[in-house]
Curated annotation (Swiss-Prot):
GO terms for molecular function: metal ion binding; metallopeptidase activity. Gene3D superfamilies: 5' to 3' exonuclease, C-terminal subdomain, Cytidine Deaminase, domain 2. Zn(2+) binds at H177, H179, D190. It comes from Clostridium botulinum (strain Okra / Type B1). Belongs to the UPF0758 family. It holds the Pfam family RadC. GO terms for biological process: proteolysis. Keywords: Hydrolase, Metal-binding, Metalloprotease, Protease, Zinc. SUPFAM superfamilies: JAB1/MPN domain, RuvA domain 2-like. A motif (JAMM motif) lies at residues 177-190. Residues 106-228 form the MPN domain. This is UPF0758 protein CLD_1541. The keyword Hydrolase applies.
Length: 228
């Protein structure tokens, strides 16, 4: 016997699917939308209660969508299947935010870079370095994580950075990394890495356009600061 509360067990006028069909998805709350995805609750909580408590317990959708599968499955009522559903939804959301017509994303300002990577990087618990490879029209053609861990100039080697750009026929690059503290203020090492990569780029003929440091919903551009 299945003891899990399903959406169909709710009164018809309270079922989020019925409300979505009748009134449109935009009228549903975050909890209702999540309930539509997860579908079933537990023997002690119906799906609406579970969805609401899940969002509250993790600190909101931003935090929910940055949980690992291990963190999600520690939450009461969330098994591997529901954790996988949440992670898939999170990834789709991130990809949609970075999608533009024709899959082309043109960089005109540091804000464009922030909009592209912020959702993926702002709540990371470790430092991660991304490289964005651009063509001659400043359209992003490739994005890759090249390093995870504490960044310093002895570890981040220009060869690893520019090798990707050369393989992908890049005209220029932008690097991005996050500060897990949430404060994007550049460290001395951040500045040293930036200057080193800028000089190497000049020699190779692939310009480092910017180094963006991501914090919690804020960023710093080395170009805007005048570092490069």
């Amino acid at each position: 016997m299945d003891n899990n509360f399903k959406i169909k067990d709710l009164p018809k006028n309270e079922r989020p699917q019925e409300r979505l069909i009748r009134y449109g998805a935009e009228v549903l709350s975050n909890s209702e939308l999540l309930a539509v995805i997860l579908r079933t609750g537990t023997k002690n909580q119906n799906i609406m209660m579970l969805a609401s408590s899940l969002i509250k317990e993790t600190g909101g959708l931003d935090q929910l969508f940055n949980q690992s599968i291990e963190e999600l499955t520690k939450i009461k009522g969330i098994g591997v299947t529901k954790a996988v559903q949440i992670l898939a939804l999170s990834e789709l959301s991130k990809r949609f935010k970075t999608y533009k017509s024709g899959n082309e994303y043109k960089i005109n300002t540091p804000l464009d870079v922030s909009n592209l990577v912020m959702e993926d990087m702002k709540y990371l618990k470790q430092e991660k370095l991304k490289i964005l490879i651009l063509n001659t029209k400043n359209i992003v053609t490739y994005i890759r994580d090249v390093f995870i861990g504490t960044l310093n100039s002895s570890i981040v080697h220009p060869r690893e950075i520019f090798c990707e750009a050369i393989k992908k026929n890049g005209a220029s690059i932008i690097i991005c990394h996050n500060h897990p503290s949430g404060d994007p203020t550049p460290s001395k090492e951040d500045i040293n890495i930036t200057l080193r990569l800028k000089e190497c780029g000049k020699l190779i003929g692939i310009d480092l356009l910017d180094h963006i440091i991501i914090g919690e919903n804020k960023y710093v551009s080395m170009k805007e600061k005048g570092t490069i």
